[in-house]
């Protein structure tokens, strides 16, 4: 038998076992009161799991010690041979039960380690998923804020667009009114131009008429002067002094010179007045170029 052949392990004291059991009870009460969190489960995995394993190991050592003592005591205490069969059967049953308990404790230890590792991995995955979910929620909130700002910007742009459309319509109305005014002014300018042309024609016609009248008056004056010359000649022939004839001739010359000078002055005054009457066209008729003037001379 392996348990009897191997040296007995050193068992812990009863007070040590009680203290460790008390720690396990307190930790169990704390878990029931506060609930399970990731930090508590990690603390349990790294601190309380070794304590539980050590308690299981102590329990196994205690069972091994009790089995060894039980195997030694029946040979010394019990003197009857009739009970040997029952002792052997009970010993075999205890050995089998102890082996089953040993196997079950090992399996339980492995199962506990597997469960703890699964819990830790599940909690890590849960925390990772929660962190990813929080980041996605933050991204979603930022996207919602951005969408709200974009909506406000679109509303402002629509308002500016409406204002620009109204301003464009007002400018279009102003442009049409200015075009109409321009057309009216153009028509008025054309009318004024036609009226100016008519006025210029009238002025030219009046100037020609005045010039013809003036030439006719000059001709009449010249005829009157020429009709008076024979009378002066007859009077000069009756006189007997040659000095008087010379004086008369000089007087005639002076009169003719003054007559020509006064005629020229009058003609120049008339032409100046006619030139100042028409502001649009200049006079193309001058005293020297007029055929009537030459005829009058």
Swiss-Prot record:
Keyword Coiled coil listed: yes
Chief place where the protein resides: cytoplasm
Compartment list: Cytoplasm
Keyword Cell inner membrane in annotation: no
Species: Arabidopsis thaliana
Keyword terms, alphabetized: Coiled coil, Cytoplasm
Cellular component GO terms, alphabetical: cytoplasm; membrane
Lineage, top ranks: Eukaryota, Viridiplantae, Streptophyta, Embryophyta, Tracheophyta
Stated role: May be involved in the receptor-like kinase-mediated signal transduction pathway.
Alphabetical list of InterPro entries matching this protein: KIP, NAB
Any one GO molecular function term: actin binding
Residues forming coiled coils: 107-130, 175-195
Location of the NAB domain: 1-77
Name of the protein in its database record: Kinase-interacting family protein
